[in-house]
Structure formats: C-alpha cells, structure tokens
C-alpha cells in the first residue's frame, strides 16, 4: 500500500473514531446507569491515539525528520497530544468529564487538518537550514504538548462556568478544594452555606442544593487547576528552548516576533491563574474566567498568529 494512502486512511480512522468516542462519552454522562460505555470510549480513544502515532511515525520514517515542520503535522501532533493526555488523566482520576470535553476538540483538530487544509499544505517538504536542528523536536513538541494540556484544563474551567451560569457559587477553602462551598441564587436573596469540615448546615430559605452537583463542581475546578498546573511548566520549558534555538539560528534570544509575543501573553495569563490559586487561594469562577481567557489566547498564539503570514513562525496560509 502506498504510504500516503495509508496515512490518509489512518487519519480518516482517527476522525471517525473520535466522533464515535465523543458520542459514547456524552451518552455515558447522560445515562450513567449504562455499564461499559466509558470503557468502550476509552478503548476507541486508545485506538485513535495509536493510529495518530503510526501516522506521525510513518512521516518521520519517510522524510527523515520529526514531523512538526508544517501546520498539518502540528495539528495531527496536537490531536495526538489531546488524546494521550486525556487517556493519562482519565486513568489517574477515573473521571469521564475529561473525555467528554477533550475528544470534541481532538475531533475538530483532526477534521480541520484533513478536510480544511489544502493538499499542498499536507505534504512534507524539505526543511530550511534553520529547522535542521534537534531543537525542532524539543521546542515544538514541548510547546504543542503544553498547548494540549492547557487547552484541556481551560475547557474544564469553561465547563465550570457553563454549569454555574445564573448562580453565584463560591468554593471555599484552599486552592485544591476542601469540600466547602457557598451558593447564592442570583434570582433570589436566599443563601445556603455548607461546610463538610465542621458538619454545620445553615439554611435561610427553603432552597434545596444538590450536594452531588456541588461535589461535581469542586471536582471540575480541582481537575482544571491540576491540569493547568501540569501544562504551565511545559510551556515555560518550551519558551526557553525556543529562545535558545533562536539564538543559535539567528543570533538573538528574543526578537518580539508575533508568535513570541503571544506566547509570552499566554504564559502571563496562566501564570496569573496559578498565582491566584496558590497565593490568593481563589477557587471557582474567578480563576475559571482567567483560564477561559487563556483558552482563547492559546488558539490565537497557535493558529491566529500563524495564519497572518508574518514572522518566523508563519505558515502564510492567509497571507
């Protein structure tokens, strides 16, 4: 079989598998009583990750360099990173939420790579001299992996904001959660305060609070924090590696290239998020808003700047 045909078949399989996995994850959340759905979705995601691994490995073998030299390859690597990180976190937390949020993004990325990009952008081309460096694999792979992790963490924060829309819910305690929360219905003046640590419930009205939902919100907030905490050090290492590579290739650590500027903005936003969690002990909506802003900025840094056709990192599609 022709190598290019095999790669296209694997990418098509990945897209179809992600579509099915997304539906299965959503059904498992809607009908938690149905057994085996989560395992099925996890198995499908694992097969998709293997398919993407084979695709990237075959391009590496065929072209002789790590497959991160163009937009098509970086999108496939991002989809691989999203599925890999999702499988890792799901294995650690046993939570279906990460799959229900990660898989749709991975599916969109795969579809965009295979359906939206022109064929000439999907083909590998010889590397320019500056890219013939081991820094290509280190810098770009770490940056893309950090993007994948930060996107997942930010998505969980967006999910938190969606669920809490219309309610003033403030989680109380340390930044990693203590089982305490305060809820205020924005449509009424009544307030209920609950603390699992002291076992006190004070009710000022007949408003009923679903404790299961509150525990879910705390889990989402917690998981978002831990995920972003994992991605931020990788982003930092990736930026430093890029600066060292830039000095080696062009004689300057930092040139305020649009990509570099937006990478710095991304770093500052997530640094502010972690600062608010660690030093201010923020939980709930305030840090979730910061993380949601970070979600937008990551995509601007990754795709928006590249499509402008300016700077060393540009793919020039819209130029």
From Swiss-Prot:
The protein's topology relative to the membrane is:
Multi-pass membrane protein
| Bilayer-spanning residue ranges | 14-34, 36-56, 69-89, 97-117, 142-162, 227-247, 254-274, 288-308
Keywords from UniProt, A to Z, are: Chloroplast, Cytochrome c-type biogenesis, Membrane, Plastid, Thylakoid, Transmembrane, Transmembrane helix
Q: Name where it mostly resides.
A: plastid
One Pfam family, please name it: Cytochrom_C_asm
Cellular component terms per the entry's GO annotation: chloroplast thylakoid membrane; plasma membrane
Signal peptide residue numbers:
none
Cited InterPro entries? Cyt_c_assembly, Cyt_c_biogenesis_CcsA, Cyt_c_biogenesis_CcsA/CcmC
Q: Is ATP-binding a UniProt keyword of this protein?
A: no
Reading the lineage from the top rank, the first entry is: Eukaryota
Say what the protein does.
Required during biogenesis of c-type cytochromes (cytochrome c6 and cytochrome f) at the step of heme attachment.
Q: Which family does it belong to?
A: Belongs to the CcmF/CycK/Ccl1/NrfE/CcsA family.
**What is the protein's given name?**
Cytochrome c biogenesis protein CcsA
The organism named in the record is Pyropia yezoensis (Susabi-nori)
């Amino acid at each position: 079989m022709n190598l290019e045909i095999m790669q296209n078949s694997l990418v098509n399989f990945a897209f179809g598998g992600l579509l099915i996995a997304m539906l299965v994850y959503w059904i498992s959340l809607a009908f938690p009583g149905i057994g085996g759905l989560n395992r099925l979705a996890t198995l499908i995601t694992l097969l998709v990750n293997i398919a993407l691994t084979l695709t990237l490995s075959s391009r590496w073998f065929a072209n002789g360099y790590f497959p991160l030299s163009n937009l098509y390859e970086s999108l496939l690597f991002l989809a691989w990173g999203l599925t890999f990180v999702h499988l890792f976190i799901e294995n650690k937390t046993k939570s279906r939420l990460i799959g229900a949020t990660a898989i749709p993004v991975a599916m969109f990325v795969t579809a965009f790579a295979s359906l939206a990009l022109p064929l000439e952008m999907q083909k590998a081309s010889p590397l320019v001299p500056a890219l013939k460096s081991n820094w290509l694999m280190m810098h770009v792979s770490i940056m893309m992996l950090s993007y994948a992790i930060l996107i997942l963490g930010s998505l969980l924060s967006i999910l938190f904001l969606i669920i809490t829309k219309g309610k003033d819910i403030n989680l109380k305690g340390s930044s990693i959660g203590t089982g305490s929360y305060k809820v205020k219905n924005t449509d009424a003046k009544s307030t209920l305060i609950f603390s699992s640590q002291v076992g006190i419930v004070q009710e000022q009205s007949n408003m009923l609070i679903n404790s299961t939902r509150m525990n879910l919100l705390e889990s989402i907030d917690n998981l978002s924090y831990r995920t972003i905490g994992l991605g931020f050090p990788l982003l930092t290492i990736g930026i430093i590696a890029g600066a060292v590579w830039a000095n080696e290739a062009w004689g300057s650590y930092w040139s305020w290239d649009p990509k570099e500027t937006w990478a710095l903005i991304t770093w500052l936003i997530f640094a502010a998020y972690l600062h608010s969690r660690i030093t201010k002990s923020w939980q709930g909506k305030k840090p979730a808003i910061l993380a949601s802003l970070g979600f937008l900025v990551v995509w601007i840094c990754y795709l928006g700047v590249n499509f402008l056709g300016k700077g060393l990192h540009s793919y020039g599609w819209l130029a």
